[in-house]
Structure formats: structure tokens, C-alpha cells
């Protein structure tokens, strides 16, 4: 019961942040995306634990701004990164899994950013997901490789659908798009996969 209460508070806080920012015109208001964010936060509040719910809220908020503005705000991910490192130190998760298992995924993410596969905001979200999986007792090596692979496929499907809709509306095809929603969908799918298996 307490978990659901904390998760609901986190979800409501995330929606208040989004709606206040949209009301003050700090971010673009999009009713469809706002409804999608509210739905994602509501579903997340029932299935995630309280630590994962904080990450989920940040992913949903970043997805909203990435779709509506093609921009990621870095304050929340950086704050979450500090929280993940503090969690690692306080709960001593580094004793369960050696820190060296984070070298390969970090190098993989940095290399992908250098070849401009990701923006700096996407890279920070990926690093937070890597830290979170490490703190949950999951080795980031295998998880991040499969996560990046599935995210790439989800993003490709998203871009195909976006361009097909654009062709129907007689718009010019686009080659860049919002990557944070693909990361959010992939995180949800991989969580369900792990939860159901």
C-alpha cells in the first residue's frame, strides 16, 4: 500500500511539473502528449517500485519534451544521476556487482554519441538507465546491449510510421526524430519482459 502511495505522489508531481510548465509556456502544450504522459505515469505507478518510478517519471517527462520540442532538459537527469550514485554508495550495491561491468556499456554509449547516433541528452538518459540497472542488481553489460538494440528497433518503427503519416499528408520525409520516447517504450517493454518471465 505504501509503495502505491509513494508512486502516486511521484506520478502526480511529474504531471504537476509538466502542466505548470505548459501553463507558463515554458514548454509546448500538447493535449494528446499530456494524456499519454498521464496514462504512462498512471500505469507505472502500479507496476514499478518506488525507485524505478522516479526513473520512469523522468523518462516520461523527457519523452514529452522530446516529442513536443525536440529538446531534452538536463536538470532532472543530472539530479537523478546524483541520486543513483548516492543510492549505490549508501546501499553498497558495488559489493554485489563489480563496478568494472559498467565500463563496456559506458564506452558503447560514448562511442555512439561520438558518431552522432545520440545527443547529449539521450546519452545522459542512457547512463542513468545503466546506473539504475546496476543498482537493481542487474549486470549492465548484457542489459544495455539488448536495451540499445531494442531501442534502435523501436526508433526505426517510430520513424517509419512518422514518415508514412508524413507521406499521406504530402510532407517531406524526415531523418531525425525524438529518441527519448523509444527509450521509454523499450524500458517499459524490457521491464514487462523481465517481470513476466
Question: What is each of the regions a protein language model found here?
Answer:
Residues 1-197:
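A membrane-topology feature that recognizes alpha-helical transmembrane segments
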Amino acid at each position: 500500500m505504501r509503495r502505491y502511495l509513494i508512486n502516486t505522489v511521484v506520478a502526480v508531481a511529474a504531471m504537476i511539473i509538466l502542466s505548470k510548465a505548459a501553463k507558463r509556456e515554458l514548454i509546448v502544450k500538447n493535449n494528446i502528449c499530456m494524456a499519454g504522459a498521464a496514462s504512462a505515469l498512471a500505469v507505472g505507478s502500479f507496476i514499478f517500485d518506488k525507485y524505478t518510478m522516479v526513473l520512469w517519471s523522468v523518462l516520461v517527462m523527457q519523452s514529452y519534451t522530446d516529442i513536443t520540442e525536440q529538446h531534452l532538459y538536463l536538470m532532472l537527469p543530472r539530479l537523478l544521476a546524483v541520486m543513483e550514485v548516492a543510492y549505490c554508495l549508501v546501499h553498497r550495491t558495488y559489493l554485489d556487482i563489480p563496478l568494472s561491468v559498467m565500463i563496456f556499456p559506458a564506452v558503447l554509449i560514448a562511442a555512439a554519441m561520438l558518431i552522432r547516433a545520440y545527443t547529449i541528452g539521450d546519452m545522459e538518459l542512457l547512463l542513468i538507465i545503466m546506473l539504475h540497472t546496476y543498482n537493481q542488481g542487474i549486470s549492465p553489460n548484457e542489459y544495455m546491449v539488448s536495451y540499445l538494440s531494442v531501442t534502435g528497433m523501436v526508433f526505426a518503427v517510430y520513424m517509419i510510421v512518422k514518415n508514412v503519416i508524413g507521406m499521406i499528408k504530402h510532407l517531406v520525409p524526415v531523418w531525425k526524430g525524438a529518441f527519448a520516447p523509444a527509450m521509454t517504450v523499450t524500458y517499459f517493454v524490457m521491464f514487462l519482459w523481465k517481470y513476466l518471465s
